[in-house]
Amino acid sequence: MDSFMKRVLFLSGPVLTLALSGCLSEPSSDAKRPEKAAEPVTGQLALYRMYQVARSWAPDVEVLAMHSIHVTEVPDVVGSAGAWQATFISEMKNAARSYTYSVIEADPNLHLGVFAGQPESSTNGLTTPFLIATVKVDTNAAYKTALAKTSEAANEQKTHTISFLLDKQEKFTNPSWRVVWGESVGTAGLSAYIDASTGEYLATMH
């Protein structure tokens, strides 16, 4: 066998070994890893996400109200929600605008991330606009306080979805979280107000 053929045979061994090892290699860890399920978020986090987008519409926006949205495709975690809707108001534009924040795309009205609605004429209601900086207490902490201060809550939480509303009413000094045992205030038999600035318990509603 001449020297050329010897060199060819000598080189083909490592090349073949590499080719076989490539075929037999294990799939990457990324290929094995299942897609992570969407997780709900707390109210304060969702509020700040929407506020960042709302400021591009009007730099003087203040919060008018916010509420949680129950999304059946997202796991229930007390103190969090799969989606939230907030309304911001601009004195400069004399208008209000609603935004949603969702952790998943859920047709027809919920879109992944922050989604802006159309501006509407500003109207005076029962709630007062407030600065986002006054919301210092998150929904998970508000829930714990409401549960501790409301004796009936332990039984109610076993059979009801927990919902949250944020606004500033005339009867309270600061904006407040309303922790609702139910999907809405209208259908709930129990709710509690927690100060969104200090975390103090304010009142129970039946």
Where are these regions (language model features)?
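Secretory targeting signatures
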Residues: 1-26
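Long, terminal "pre-/pro-" and other extracytoplasmic accessory regions
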Residues: 9, 23-206
